[in-house]
Amino acid sequence: DVMFSNIMVGRDITKSISMDLGNFSSSYSLLIGIPQGVASAMSASMLPSVVASFTDRDYDSIYDKITKTLKTNMFIAVPSFVGLFIIGQPIIKLLFSRYNSVQGGMMLKIGAIAVVFYTLSTVTSTALQGIDRVNVPMIHSSISLAVHVVLVFVLLKFSALGIYAVVIGNATFPILIFILNLRTLYQEIDYTMPYISVFAKPGISALVMGVFTWLSYKGMYTLTSSNVLALVIAFMVALITYFGPYYALTKMRVFE
């Protein structure tokens, strides 16, 4: 925020700084932070059992617990990402009417993927703590922070992205942490994440959900011109079109 303010002041566009930062801090960060909070809670519950399995040198149990926690978190994070990407703008228009919903919606289109990677980085950081590598996540976060600062500075200084540069930095920050965490888990306990079983079911289900959610919102808004009513219908459609395909794929056991 300080970097953004200083560079934007240098460009003599101070009028929009407060509104841009308010939109980022309130609408974007708050909506992104809700599923992240769920991930933190689930990861915390995983820690004691991973510690117990590591004490017994039961690596198969550790693999199973990490993978199950990743699957559970992706069950929430992936549709959250798709939902914020698809109908982020009308959600902001409803909840944060004082801010520019078009700008906020674009922030979510650019940065909603952070929901997935913050979740992945949180789970893998907890797993590293569970195998007695407590300081490693902090080191990885420091490395990612250094890259983050350089990236945001370059984007702010040499592009016209403005607040979107901060969003890009926020979205890319957890990606490097996750990559470094996963690499260390492989080195320490030979853990390899089963990408297909972790991402396939929520990914396919969320894509189906996204299409029907967008169509239902657009259709209802065209008919009624009511953002609230269109969102209510869209949320109902989202629930049905996500859980339906997910349940079907689970019963088929295609990606197990």
Indicate residue ranges for each PLM-predicted region.
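Transmembrane alpha-helical segments of multi-pass transport proteins
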Residues: 197-254
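Short membrane-interface helical motifs at transmembrane helix boundaries
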Residues: 81-98, 153, 158, 220
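Interfacial segments at transmembrane-helix termini and the short loops linking adjacent helices
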Residues: 20, 67, 85-115, 225
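Membrane-interface helix-loop junctions in multi-pass transport and translocation proteins
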Residues: 135, 145-182, 193, 215-236
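Short alpha-helical transmembrane segments in multi-pass integral membrane proteins
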Residues: 65-86, 163-188, 203
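Membrane-interface junctions at transmembrane-helix termini in multi-pass inner-membrane proteins
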Residues: 113-143
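Helix-loop junctions and terminal segments of transmembrane helices
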Residues: 37-70, 125-127
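Transmembrane helical elements of multi-pass membrane transporters/channels
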Residues: 1-48, 52, 209, 213, ...
